[in-house]
Amino acid sequence: MTDAKQFYDYHSWANKKIFTHIENLPEETAYQEVKSVFPSVSDVLLHMCRADYIWLNVLSGVAYQEIIDSAGKLQSAQGNMAAIKQHAAELESQYHDFFSRQTDLEQTFTMQHPKLGTLESTYADTILHVVNHGTYHRGNVTAMLRQLDHSGVPTDYMYYLYEKRESKG
């Protein structure tokens, strides 16, 4: 079984592919309104950053209300792709810091939610949730780009593995 850190590395790789692809499209593409689950591509990407931020804090043991109160700081990036990309890069670095501190990802921890209650999970399962959430929303981005008459970019896990293999020589 591949470990959760590799899946997180895939998540980061795929997000970078999306950001690079969007940077090569007309600038207005990221902000154009579409009829979809989010009003624009930039809104989806900001949502993904917010979710990654929230889950990193859950993994780090931060209390629910403190996470919710601090997640609003990402809102300043609304409508600013450069700021969203910067947040994504900072989050990637923070996740790698987490991985360096938490070496046993199969260890269980307890999370608290005011409505859903208490859940015991492993760090690995929670990281896989982060990756799965990102995969879902990268699919949203691709669908939105197609609505705007632009192609998507392949971000399937197998593309990551092929690229990883090629970079090893």
UniProtKB/Swiss-Prot annotation:
Keywords attached to this entry = Metal-binding
Q: Which domain of life does this protein belong to?
A: Bacteria
Coiled-coil regions listed = none
Matching InterPro entries, A to Z? DinB (IPR007837), DinB/YfiT-like (IPR034660)
Give any GO molecular function from the UniProt entry.
Answer: metal ion binding
Q: Which residues bind a divalent metal cation?
A: H47, H133, H137
Similarity section: Belongs to the DinB family.
List the protein's name.
Uncharacterized protein YisT
Native organism taxonomy: Bacteria, Bacillati, Bacillota, Bacilli, Bacillales
Q: Per UniProt, what is the name of the gene that codes for the protein in this document?
A: yisT
